[in-house]
Amino acid sequence: MPKSNHSTAPLPFPILIGDIGGTNARFSILTDAYAEPKQFPNVRTADFATIDEAIQKGVLDKTAVQPRSAILAVAGPINDDEIPLTNCAWVVRPKTMIEGLGIEDVLVVNDFEAQALAIAALSDENRERIGSATGDMVASRVVLGPGTGLGVGGLVHAQHTWIPVPGEGGHIDLGPRSKRDYEIFPHIETIEGRVSAEQILCGRGLVNLYNAICVVDGIQPTMKDPADITSHALDGSDKVAVETVSLFATYLGRVAGDMAMVFMARGGVYLSGGISQKIIPALKKPEFRQAFEDKAPHSALLRTIPTYVVTHPLAALAGLSSYARMPANFGVSTEGRRWRR
């Protein structure tokens, strides 16, 4: 009977690695510690009733390699033997996977733990620097990912070990500071009366911010898709879209600076996800770094902390692969999150 336990033993190879998002799931297989991961085509979560079916048809039916273990990154709380995902209908049931897919060892981690693992050793070709600060590369870091929501994860460096720290940093309060903020914030859609960072710093948050600006300026909104807003902002064809993305970058800078101070992230703050990649030109304008550094009495500290956009196309899989190869380099807690035959 499969059981949940705490184990420091390495996962046995071959290892199935999965990054499970709300819309797409990405999988690879790592055959040994020295091999390059074998990538599989992205799987649309809506195309399969269960994650087990997606793994069987999207991975196992396409390879002769039978994984002995699996490490899966999911968006959702990992509190029991059934793990519902936040943004799709799948439920991860490790015991069922072990019984039905021939896998003997399953580890489930938070999606932003995987992103945090990825930023431990990103090369320059997989990141775009924002601003001129270079920082101390062997030091604690933090990653923020505006996407379906706002994910936040820390990566603490201590005793020659990288320790990923998952959390719910995307739900911290975000309040107005400038005169323009005080005009706009009363029109931001709230959750139970409060504006969290995620109410602005994600895809739907971008639309939320755009609509609030339209209300303040007495303009009828014409866009409902975050991609439309960003594209019109970047080409300068819509003034409300331009201001929306400019303020988005400002507010992202404020939150990123806060997280840098929480984690003393001298090794850098990393922005992950498709939104960050798409708005790199806006992030390179002064607003983002100005907001990031505007943290009196610690502005001098913030000026030394580098900021990057993660450009690696499969960052979470890369982070999980790094852990799978060399688990001793990372302080990943497996208690209550690892199931073995």
Curated annotation (Swiss-Prot):
It catalyses: D-glucose + ATP = D-glucose 6-phosphate + ADP + H(+). CDD domains: ASKHA_NBD_GLK. ATP binds at G18, D19, I20, G21, G22, T23. GO terms for cellular component: cytosol. Gene3D superfamilies: 3.30.420.40, 3.40.367.20. Its EC number is 2.7.1.2. Its main location: cytoplasm. One of its GO terms (molecular function) is D-glucose binding. Keywords: ATP-binding, Cytoplasm, Glycolysis, Kinase, Nucleotide-binding, Transferase. One of its GO terms (biological process) is glycolytic process. Pfam families: Glucokinase. The keyword Nucleotide-binding applies. Belongs to the bacterial glucokinase family. This is Glucokinase. The gene is glk.
